[in-house]
């Protein structure tokens, strides 16, 4: 991995370049140029410069890119190509770790006799992750396994990347429409220590594998062995959801059934896991999911999970029920009493109604077709500073226990839009979110 100082030097070049472009753009406007055209040109060039530099980074930037990947569907068409190119670079495979380093990490983590635990070990990496790479191997009992090995120095490099990226949240947000960058980076930073210790991921994965053991629609590979910087799990062969998204763009007519099934399964997995496992899978990006040949959805990364031992909070279901029935006066009272309104701020139920309506389409029908155009429209309204609803949004907040829930919900919806899929959203809500059915019946 590159040294942190090299990363910081590259990132330090960005503000000067963007500031220079802004000055030129301001001068052109003073000279009578078209404001919209000049602003679009400025944003395009700023985006290209920012993405070009971030695309060279790994670690924190790669994790950041994975988090942003679910927002791709919300980006306006004029930014779509540079945004997708940037995501490709941010998530691209890192240069492979020298095999001597891989063996050294295995010596340190599994003991110098680690080779006796494997019948065979492929020295060529099968895949790369943000802080490590995966090798295919055969365990001593004959099982095919995936061996995830953390890059030496990944912890220091990741912390350095995230510290620098956190200083750039405003700049990044200005060229990525619809992306609420600051909380994304805050979450990644907060969970860095957990994700750097693969024993935490192993514990999460064991819980999910137990909860979904024998499930007809989902499969979680079992953990075979674990250490702080090495994780060995069962190997699964399947088609990544990221590949299905791409295939759907190339052949929309021939993939409708598959895309709808994938989106429905991902929705069911995220909605059901707090009840089944007591945890929420908190890293919803397409690279963490695969469709197997038998039609089951496989989930293969559990580095980020949020504990929900009692399932989703019933208040969530109550809020959705009130929004469905447009009982915004009661919803506003509920939001005040449970900390969704910043203390000292005043919001009317009419303002809440106007603010929430663009987001409530998926809960108005039994089944909803998520598309890029819908996501773009919603994101556009949410970030249009000329709209009074944006001012309303500035008076709202997410209580800490809801931050990860809404992050996962937003990520799942983003993937559904990328899949251009129809999902029985309300049925999932009724089946798995407590408070929804009861509150509607009570109302």
Q: What is the role of each PLM region?
A:
Residues 276-286:
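Catalytic-loop of the protein kinase fold
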Residues 315-318:
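Short amphipathic alpha-helical recognition elements used for nucleic-acid or partner binding
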Residues 1-273, 278, 291-298, 302-310, ...:
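Broad phosphate/nucleotide-binding scaffolds in NTP-utilizing and phosphate-metabolizing enzymes
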């Amino acid at each position: 991995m590159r040294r942190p100082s090299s990363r910081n030097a590259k990132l330090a070049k960005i503000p000067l370049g963007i500031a220079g472009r802004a000055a030129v753009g301001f001068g052109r406007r003073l000279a009578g140029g078209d404001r919209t055209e000049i602003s679009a040109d400025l944003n395009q060039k700023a985006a290209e410069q920012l993405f070009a530099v971030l695309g060279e980074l790994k670690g924190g930037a790669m994790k950041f890119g994975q988090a942003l990947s679910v927002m791709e569907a919300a980006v306006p068409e004029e930014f779509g190509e540079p945004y997708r190119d940037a995501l490709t670079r941010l998530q691209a495979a890192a240069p492979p770790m020298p095999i001597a380093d891989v063996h050294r990490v295995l010596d340190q983590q599994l003991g110098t006799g680690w080779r006796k635990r494997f019948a065979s070990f492929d020295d060529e990496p099968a895949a790369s992750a943000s802080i490590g790479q995966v090798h295919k191997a055969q365990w001593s009992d004959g099982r095919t396994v995936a061996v995830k090995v953390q890059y030496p120095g990944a912890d220091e490099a990741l912390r350095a990347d995230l510290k620098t990226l956190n200083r750039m949240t405003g700049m990044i947000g200005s060229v990525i429409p619809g992306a609420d960058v600051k909380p994304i980076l805050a979450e990644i930073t907060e969970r860095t220590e957990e994700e750097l210790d693969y024993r935490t991921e192993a514990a999460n994965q064991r819980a999910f594998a137990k909860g979904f053991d024998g499930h007809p629609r989902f499969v979680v590979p079992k953990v075979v062995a674990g250490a702080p910087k090495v994780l060995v799990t069962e190997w699964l062969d399947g088609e990544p959801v990221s590949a299905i998204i791409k295939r759907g763009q190339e052949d929309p007519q021939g993939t409708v059934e598959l895309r709808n099934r994938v989106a429905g399964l991902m929705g069911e997995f995220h909605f059901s896991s707090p009840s089944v496992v007591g945890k929420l899978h908190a890293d919803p990006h397409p690279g963490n999911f695969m469709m197997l040949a038998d039609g089951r959805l496989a989930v293969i990364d559990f580095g980020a999970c949020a504990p929900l031992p009692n399932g989703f909070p019933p208040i969530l279901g109550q809020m959705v029920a009130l929004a469905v029935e447009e009982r915004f006066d009661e919803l506003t009272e509920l939001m005040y009493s449970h900390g969704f309104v910043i203390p000292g701020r005043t919001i009317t139920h009419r303002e809440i109604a106007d603010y929430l309506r663009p987001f409530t389409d998926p809960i108005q029908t039994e089944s909803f077709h998520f598309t890029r155009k819908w996501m773009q429209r919603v994101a556009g309204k949410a970030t249009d500073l000329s709209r009074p609803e944006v001012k309303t949004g500035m008076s709202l907040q997410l209580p800490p226990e809801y931050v990860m829930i809404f992050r996962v919900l937003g990520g799942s919806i983003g993937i559904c839009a990328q899949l251009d899929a129809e999902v029985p959203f309300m049925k999932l809500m009724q089946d798995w979110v407590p408070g929804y059915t009861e509150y509607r019946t009570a109302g």
